[in-house]
Regions:
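N-terminal nucleophile
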Residues: 1-188
Length: 188
């Protein structure tokens, strides 16, 4: 798993994504997956030409063998050609990866509104947030959520960068599926 978090700030939106990729070996007789290691070289954030940020967690390949990054990039190209709204783009992205084991988050500013859209694997509905959101290994994040919510209020993007790095590191200390370092992207 991984962790992607977004915070809506007074002057923009900040998104963090860890780098951890979990490596599995599949037992050919049972189909059971076993963790064999980790690598910290996987980028989970993509900035679009329309200045939106898309984050994803889950497997790097869909059930049909396609790479998730390739599917997302192709969906973005179509979305930009058609000039889709953030909501329509997100719905299209979900339709492209729905059969995999992935979750998505997309942030952007549209009509002066700061928007965070979240879809967890298996959800029927999209969550629309005004404050922020998280996808991935959010179970480990739950113990920090009340402190995080207090610290998050009325932040500017510069402060939110340090806040997301701090919580990413804290959560990484509790679960091996999250790297202690994370990449940051900002929309203003």
């Amino acid at each position: 798993m991984s962790l992607v978090m977004a915070v809506v700030c007074t002057d923009g939106i900040v998104v963090s994504g860890d780098f951890r990729k979990t490596e599995f070996k599949v037992n050919p007789q049972t189909g059971e997956k076993r963790i064999i290691g980790f690598s910290d070289d996987s980028h989970k954030l993509i900035r679009t030409k329309s200045d939106r940020i898309i984050g994803h967690t889950g497997y790097n390949k869909l059930n049909n063998g396609e790479l998730v990054d390739t599917v997302i990039q192709n969906a973005i190209l179509l979305s930009e050609t058609l000039k889709l709204s953030i909501y329509d783009e997100f719905r299209y992205l979900i339709s492209c990866i729905r059969d995999g084991q992935n979750s998505l988050i997309e942030v952007g500013i549209e009509n002066s509104q700061k928007i965070v859209l979240v879809w967890e694997c298996g959800d029927k509905e999209i969550s629309v947030n005004q404050q922020g959101g998280a996808i991935g290994d959010t179970e480990a994040f739950k113990k920090y959520i009340s402190a995080f919510e207090k610290e998050r209020e009325n932040r500017v993007t510069e402060d939110a960068i340090a806040l997301l790095q701090k919580y990413n590191h804290l959560i990484a200390n509790e679960t091996p599926t999250i790297s202690p370092e994370c990449e940051i992207m900002v929309i203003q």
